Amino acid sequence: MSRRPVWIDGSDMRPAPLRTAAWLRACLLVGLSTLAMPGWASAPPCPQMTPEAMQNDYQALDARIARWDRAYYRQGQRLVDDGTYDSAKRRLAHWAECFPLLAKPSVNTHEPTGAKHHPVAQTGIAKLPDRDAVAGWVARQGDHPLWVQPKVDGVAVTLVYRHGRLAAAISRGDGVSGQDWYTKALHIAAIPSHLPADAPPLVILQGELYARRTAHRQSRDGTDGARARIAGLMARDTLTDREGSTIGLFVWAWPNGPDTMPERLETLAGWGFGDVAEMTHGVATAEDIAAWRQRWYRHALPFATDGVVVKRGDRPPGSDWQASPPDWAMAWKYPAREALARVDALEFSVGRTGRIAVVAELEPVLLGDKRVTRVSLGSLAHWRRTDVRPGDQVRLRLAGLTIPQLQEVVVRTRPRPQVDAPEADQYDRLSCLRFTPACRDQFLARLEWLGSDEGLDFPGIGPATWNQLVDAGLVKGLLDWRTLDTAALEALPGVGKKTARAWQRHFALADTRSAVRWLRALGVPAVPRQALTDALERYGMAGLGTLAPPDWRDYSGIGETRAMQLTRFFRDTDIRHWLASLESTRALQKQHGTNTRNEQKGDVRRVDVKQDNGTTWLPEQDSNLRPND
């Protein structure tokens, strides 16, 4: 089936005259810096847009991210999946690199910082996209010991113990300061109010508050709203003991603890934080990390996770930590089930029954472990309602394991590009029975159906064959293949005598197919098999055009709408002509008692034609003709 891609109008690409020189200098600098970056070939290209259009899209996406942040940090509502959020942040950063003269600092509403300063900064963590990036990071760590932990899906907290007593609990905030969560922490049973007597006078722990789960399998259960639930609870003015009992704690850092990971884990386990010791493992290669990532993704855990974290065991002292991702730790998240994607083009295709389908061609994006480049937008009417255009940023989600679906348009590019879409009223069940350039999609779809096992069953004759016959001008009407001779077929490029004769044998066998099967191949509207068989027995194929809607309604299972469709179908000029020709051929076959053998590659298949007033029976299990849509 041919494609009709629609691109943003080239006239929209011209930069404003007053900014042209600066624009070109900026783009040149960005281009040179991109070429110098390792792995530059995998980076998405910079959008080809005017400065004004780019600024509009940048501000629109920045505003949407700010809205997500406000909902998450202030109301505890998670409006989008992490995959969408992360890809939106990456896209914004990419645009800022592409257009440094236009980009403005992102105004994101992070968790309210409050007045409590972290004694050691919460660093955040760099997220690596794939195994190759992980392997590169591992190689850069040299001989430093590496440890892997599950990346718990919750909210970060800093706990401060002075002389064994809990003295402070601080939300992450901006990594430097956060909200005072001390009062709420006293209601969370997982946070001990005291440490053993042998604890150092000052203990600073960083960890994740998470929603307790029983046998949570990330591959099966997903995030399950776990992080949003905890964010919502901690955003409340008060927390009850009952609510606190649903919250767990995973300590992932002891900034002022012993120098080595084994020492830290042993002490933490002795203090009651045994889960961190059980779920922290030494690794040496990207393969080791991948194995733990897969294990924790598939196996039951007491919390939701969204990947793994790997860090050096001998990291710098906490006094050197900053509120930015360090080079001694990284995260490798699970495959995203949601992501943001840019629409590059729209493709319109007309199906066999005249239904117009719309597909968006995308800038490649990873969903699950799939590289997604296309997503269905449904029918022409549905596309018009969603109004997706090239340049738009859309949110995708995996349905099941493999099928991407459009969830919403996150950013509508401005100005809106013009789209040359086909008109729905140009195509229907009886359009394109003959080839014209505007009919190519539907005509080829008709031929493909006709030759499939749903139609006349031509083994080995598929879309490529029909394309070749149409392009050569040999098939201009739906049944022109019936009159092709061997010489015409052999003249086609790449088609030898053997192939030409095989095609002709299949074409010749079509005359032995049942009348019901022929009608289905031609695209008759869906109708109860018994009704069509009865009508054929009474009127024959050529006589069906004499029936009016009331005649069809006399048959069981046929209502007013279907009766009108059948009348229109059988009164079509081409359909009537073809049915008359077929009935004439079948009458001659019946007169001569045709028996046909199909010999192909040593397989002899006997085709016995059982005639019954010009009809034969389809398999018993096929009690109704299948719908044509």
From Swiss-Prot:
Its EC number is 6.5.1.2. GO terms for biological process: DNA repair; DNA replication. It catalyses: NAD(+) + (deoxyribonucleotide)n-3'-hydroxyl + 5'-phospho-(deoxyribonucleotide)m = (deoxyribonucleotide)n+m + AMP + beta-nicotinamide D-nucleotide. Keywords: DNA damage, DNA repair, DNA replication, Ligase, NAD. Residues 588-597, 612-629 have a biased composition (Polar residues). It holds the Pfam family DNA_ligase_OB. SUPFAM superfamilies: DNA ligase/mRNA capping enzyme, catalytic domain (SSF56091), Nucleic acid-binding proteins (SSF50249), RuvA domain 2-like (SSF47781). GO terms for molecular function: DNA ligase (NAD+) activity. Transmembrane segments: none annotated. It comes from the Bacteria. PANTHER family: DNA LIGASE, DNA LIGASE B. NCBIfam families: PRK08097.1. Belongs to the NAD-dependent DNA ligase family. LigB subfamily. Catalyzes the formation of phosphodiester linkages between 5'-phosphoryl and 3'-hydroxyl groups in double-stranded DNA using NAD as a coenzyme and as the energy source for the reaction. This is DNA ligase B. It comes from Chromohalobacter salexigens (strain ATCC BAA-138 / DSM 3043 / CIP 106854 / NCIMB 13768 / 1H11).
